[in-house]
Amino acid sequence: MPGFKFGKDQRLLRASEFQEVFDLNTCKISHPNWLLLAKFNTSYGSRLGLVIGKKNIPTAVGRNYVKRLARETFRKSDFPCSIDVIFLARKGADKLNSQDMALLLQESWCRLRQRCEASKAKNA
């Protein structure tokens, strides 16, 4: 199944890439269990960076669960513009069941897409 891979070209890898999104984000979506920060990029396509701290989700099982669902829903959502997104987990993100979390993440990705498109249209 080559079409379902989440490769290195779809991830933020270096600290400088993360810092750039933290410093220059143009879109922000807040949810009680996570925060999404996004910045337009020029040449990469859409990329995702995950920040899931041990302080907010203490167990490795919980952190891996949140990462897996965030990656999967991001991969399935199609972003028409090239953006870098940081998913920042908050306390309680691992307490949601997978169906609820997947649905809430899809809604968050849709809101982020709409907000980024509006921001891009405003700046054009």
Regions found by a protein language model. Name each.
Residues 1-124:
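Positively charged, solvent-exposed patches that mediate nucleic-acid binding
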